[in-house]
């Protein structure tokens, strides 16, 4: 099967799901087959338990909105607003002069270049984002976790698509105390990496459903006016 290679502007949305501000103790976790965890795992004996805690924290977050800063592989910096609602919905609205708007309605992810008036689509299920916008997030089952480093103030998880259909890897950086998602990094197979840092997040509030609808005709009319 042909591998899915996503544009970097779509790949940056791979892991949009935020953790709750305060994490609750996860229930006992007993995987059916115990995997073998080696370096770069700093606490290999407790990886299953730690992943279960991260899952529980992310599953406790059904929505958030706030700010993001993106650093592209070439060092270019973009800022903007993010809205996320599980399952399946996310919106990245870039500040000018970046013309991009990226929206998932739960089925399809659309990238709109507001200068060129172009719309590029990819099924949400074909992106790594699908794993982390699910109604029930389970990192151990849904991805191949290839690293979990517990550092002072941070837990750093690296995962990739276990099926081999998607290129690259994703690194998630969590606050070690609250397990709130702070940063994610998308690494591609060409040595490039895109970093997205989240800030000023408000969790589990109501979000206007229209944020996750992208209509081509209305956007074009708005641009011409």
Language-model region placement:
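Sec-dependent N-terminal signal peptides
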Residues: 1-21
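Compositionally biased, proline/threonine/alanine/serine-rich low-complexity intrinsically disordered stretches
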Residues: 17-53, 216-225
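An acidic-aromatic
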Residues: 24-30, 81-130, 194-195, 200
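A short, Trp-centered hydrophobic/proline-enriched beta-strand micro-motif
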Residues: 56-73
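Extracytoplasmic
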Residues: 59-63, 77-79, 85-87, 96-97, ...
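Short hydrophobic/aromatic-rich beta-strand segments that constitute the beta-sheet cores
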Residues: 66, 90-94, 109-112, 157, ...
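Flexible, surface-exposed loop/linker segments and immediately adjacent secondary-structure boundaries
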Residues: 116-155, 160-163
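Gly/Pro-enriched, hydrophobic low-complexity segments
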Residues: 140-141, 150-225
């Amino acid at each position: 099967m042909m591998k899915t290679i996503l544009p970097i502007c779509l790949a940056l949305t791979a892991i949009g799901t935020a953790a709750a501000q305060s994490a609750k103790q996860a229930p006992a976790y007993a995987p059916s087959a115990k995997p073998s965890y080696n370096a770069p795992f700093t606490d290999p004996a407790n990886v299953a338990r730690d992943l279960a805690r991260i899952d529980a924290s992310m599953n406790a977050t059904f929505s958030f909105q706030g700010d993001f800063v993106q650093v592209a592989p070439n060092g270019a910096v973009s800022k903007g607003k993010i809205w996320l609602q599980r399952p399946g919905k996310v919106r990245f609205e870039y500040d000018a002069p970046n013309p991009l708007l990226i929206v998932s309605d739960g089925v399809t992810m659309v990238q709109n270049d507001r200068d060129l008036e172009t719309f590029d689509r990819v099924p949400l299920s074909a992106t790594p984002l699908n794993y982390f916008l699910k109604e029930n997030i389970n990192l151990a089952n849904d991805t191949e976790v290839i690293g979990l480093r517990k550092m002072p103030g941070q837990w750093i998880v690296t995962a990739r698509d276990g099926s081999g259909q998607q290129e690259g890897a994703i690194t998630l950086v969590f606050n070690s105390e609250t397990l709130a998602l702070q940063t994610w990094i998308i690494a591609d197979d060409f040595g490039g990496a895109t970093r997205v840092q989240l800030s000023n997040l408000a969790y589990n509030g109501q979000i206007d459903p229209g944020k996750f609808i992208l209509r081509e005709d209305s956007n074009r009319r708005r641009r011409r006016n």
